């Protein structure tokens, strides 16, 4: 009887240990966000927006909700990031395999402690900002982010050349072709990381709605314990036309719970397809207040264009500027 009891106890111990191991390997995370937005220089029923990705509604609106399922084995793993809501539909162009619900879905293999292969769809390596608002300081998005890729479908290899230097090489479908490519064309991506600064290159043919060539620098510096300066700059060319821009992200932490930051961005168009070579100065001031897993972000944004009048003021007259106040709430789990 004692032997039987010991055997059962041993099996139960193994089961509990295996269960604990599985719980550590499998994780669920995600976020939910919503916002309120009102224009300061125009009527809320004017039907206009800044012209950047996401958060383009007035009044109360849903951003997105996403759930990330991750399984990490000893050397292999998989990630599925499911998303819904207007921000999710915009990020996947609502033309996904399952009607815009798959943000990311990929498998990976840690070939060694210095080499990782990733196969599937993954969010872009270009730019300072990302799709999920929980990972951005500003709630609204920049022009640089809005005009670059959101995601890539393909194969990439990440190499840790040292503790502070990395290299990524990628072969993908053309710009934001998230599921099936009907053109038979491919894009190439390269990222060189150097002490927290990243030089990114992307190129496709530019035809069939492709992006063409883009070079991007993304980085930042901790100037003091409480002051961080983020930097993003990019140049795009597609058959002689494209965009350019630069953005600074100074952010100051005033306490453990509150930070304030500015995004100052200059963005412009160039080339034969843009004869007026319009440009915009976009200033966004954002506060960030943290309550446990909830982030509350009040934000004021002003965009002012040169050689373009894309907005309508409160009198219904075309104008070159638009300002808005936004209050967003983001919960992460």
Regions inferred by a protein language model and the residue ranges of each:
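Cleavable N-terminal export/targeting peptides
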Residues: 1-25
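Short N-terminal segments immediately surrounding and downstream of signal-peptide cleavage
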Residues: 20-36
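Outer-membrane beta-barrel channels and translocator barrels
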Residues: 21-23, 72-76, 112-114, 162-164, ...
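Residues on the lipid-exposed face of transmembrane beta-strands in outer-membrane beta-barrel proteins
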Residues: 30, 34, 62-71, 105-109, ...
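Short beta-strand segments enriched in hydrophobic/aromatic residues
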Residues: 34, 71-73, 82-84, 111, ...
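Surface-exposed coil loops of outer-membrane beta-barrel proteins
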Residues: 35-59, 88-104, 112-193, 199-203
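Outer-membrane beta-barrel pore domains
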Residues: 50-55, 88-98, 196-199, 207-333
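Glycine- and aromatic-enriched membrane insertion/assembly motifs of diderm outer-membrane
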Residues: 55-86
């Amino acid at each position: 009887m004692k032997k039987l009891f010991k055997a059962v106890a041993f099996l139960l111990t193994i089961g509990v240990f295996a269960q604990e191991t599985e719980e550590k390997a499998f994780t669920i995370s995600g976020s939910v966000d919503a916002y309120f937005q009102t224009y300061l220089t125009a009527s809320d029923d004017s039907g206009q927006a800044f012209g950047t990705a996401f958060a383009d509604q007035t009044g109360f609106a849903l951003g997105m909700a996403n759930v990330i399922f991750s399984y990490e084995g000893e050397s292999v793993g998989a990630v599925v990031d499911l998303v819904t809501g207007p921000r999710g539909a915009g990020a996947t162009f609502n033309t996904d395999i399952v009607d815009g619900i798959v943000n990311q879905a990929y498998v990976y293999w840690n070939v060694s402690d210095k080499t990782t292969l990733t196969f599937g769809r993954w969010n872009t390596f270009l730019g300072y900002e990302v799709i999920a608002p929980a990972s951005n300081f500003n709630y609204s998005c920049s022009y640089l982010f809005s005009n670059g890729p959101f995601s890539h479908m393909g194969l990439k290899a990440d190499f840790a050349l040292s503790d502070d230097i990395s290299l990524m090489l990628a072969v993908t479908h053309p710009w934001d072709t998230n599921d099936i490519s009907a053109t038979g064309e491919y894009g190439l991506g390269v990222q060189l990381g150097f002490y927290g600064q990243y030089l990114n290159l992307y190129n496709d043919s530019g035809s069939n709605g492709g992006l063409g060539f883009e070079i991007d620098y993304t980085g930042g510096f901790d100037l003091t314990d409480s002051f961080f300066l983020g930097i993003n700059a990019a140049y795009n060319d597609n058959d002689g036309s494209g965009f350019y821009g630069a953005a600074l992200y100074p952010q100051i932490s005033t306490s453990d719970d509150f930070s304030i930051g500015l995004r100052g961005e200059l963005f412009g168009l160039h080339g034969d397809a843009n004869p007026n070579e319009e440009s915009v100065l976009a200033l966004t001031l954002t506060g960030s207040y943290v309550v446990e897993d909830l982030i509350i972000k009040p934000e004021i944004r002003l965009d002012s264009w040169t050689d373009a009048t894309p907005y309508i003021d409160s009198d219904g007259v075309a104008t070159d500027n638009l300002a808005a106040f936004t209050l967003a709430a983001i919960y992460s789990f």
